[in-house]
């Protein structure tokens, strides 16, 4: 799957769950489960409830995603 096949959306972290998983509320009102990407994990970027994040989703499963960026 190429990079252009992913859907990028913005949302806010609603809740922190075990194993670096987060409940993210998207700007359109939907809530999804999202895990953090490898670069965020590698650089020890902390994500807390209330943070604005960019989420990458696949068109095949719209209930899960990957957090690729934390906005300042």
Swiss-Prot record:
Entry keywords, A to Z: Cytoplasm, Initiation factor, Protein biosynthesis, RNA-binding, rRNA-binding
Subcellular location field: Cytoplasm
Gene3D superfamilies, A to Z: Nucleic acid-binding proteins
Record GO terms (molecular function): ribosome binding; rRNA binding; translation initiation factor activity
Domain S1-like: 1-72
CDD domains: S1_IF1
Domain of life of the native organism: Bacteria
N-terminal signal peptide: none
Annotated PROSITE patterns: S1_IF1_TYPE (PS50832)
Main location: cytoplasm
Ribosomal protein is among the record's keywords: no
Quaternary state and interactors: Component of the 30S ribosomal translation pre-initiation complex which assembles on the 30S ribosome in the order IF-2 and IF-3, IF-1 and N-formylmethionyl-tRNA(fMet); mRNA recruitment can occur at any time during PIC assembly.
Known role: One of the essential components for the initiation of protein synthesis. Stabilizes the binding of IF-2 and IF-3 on the 30S subunit to which N-formylmethionyl-tRNA(fMet) subsequently binds. Helps modulate mRNA selection, yielding the 30S pre-initiation complex (PIC). Upon addition of the 50S ribosomal subunit IF-1, IF-2 and IF-3 are released leaving the mature 70S translation initiation complex.
Protein family membership: Belongs to the IF-1 family.
Protein name in the entry: Translation initiation factor IF-1
Provenance organism: Vesicomyosocius okutanii subsp. Calyptogena okutanii (strain HA)
């Amino acid at each position: 799957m190429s990079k252009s096949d992913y859907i990028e959306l913005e949302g806010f972290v609603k809740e922190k769950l075990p194993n670096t998983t987060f409940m993210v509320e998207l700007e359109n009102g939907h809530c999804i489960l999202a895990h953090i990407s490898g670069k965020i994990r590698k650089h020890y970027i902390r994500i807390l409830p209330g943070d604005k994040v960019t989420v990458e989703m696949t068109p095949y499963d719209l209930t899960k995603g990957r957090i690729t960026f934390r906005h300042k």
